[in-house]
Amino acid sequence: MTYFTSWDEFAKAAERLHSANPEKCRFVTKYNHTKGQLVLKLTDDVVCLQYSTNQLQDVKKLEKLSSTLLRGIVTQ
């Protein structure tokens, strides 16, 4: 598992992993209510990328990343 501390690094790695094999990739979001923390995980069962945040601005970036990944699926 690779844990990222920077959103930009996570987003670039997620796009690379997804473009390599979009059929096997899974994108999971988990929110911990007590800690106020959002955990994002993208995996293809070989490589696992994780990013954790408690910032609202990162949620908006998540929306942009998920739309980019979905756009990649639709265009194939």
UniProtKB/Swiss-Prot annotation:
Keywords per UniProt: Cytoplasm, Ribonucleoprotein, RNA-binding, Signal recognition particle
Molecular function as annotated in GO: 7S RNA binding
InterPro entries, per the entry: Signal_recog_particle_SRP9/14, SRP9, SRP9-like, SRP9_dom
Record GO cellular component, one term: signal recognition particle, endoplasmic reticulum targeting
GO BP annotation list: negative regulation of translational elongation; SRP-dependent cotranslational protein targeting to membrane
Compartment list: Cytoplasm
Stated family: Belongs to the SRP9 family.
Subunit structure: Heterodimer with SRP14; binds RNA as heterodimer. Component of a signal recognition particle complex that consists of a 7SL RNA molecule of 300 nucleotides and six protein subunits: srpa-72, srpa-68, SRP54, F37F2.2/SRP19, F25G6.8/SRP14 and ZK512.4/SRP9.
Known role: Component of the signal recognition particle (SRP) complex, a ribonucleoprotein complex that mediates the cotranslational targeting of secretory and membrane proteins to the endoplasmic reticulum (ER). SRP9 together with SRP14 and the Alu portion of the SRP RNA, constitutes the elongation arrest domain of SRP. The complex of SRP9 and SRP14 is required for SRP RNA binding.
Protein's name according to its UniProt entry: Signal recognition particle 9 kDa protein
Species in which this protein is naturally found: Caenorhabditis elegans
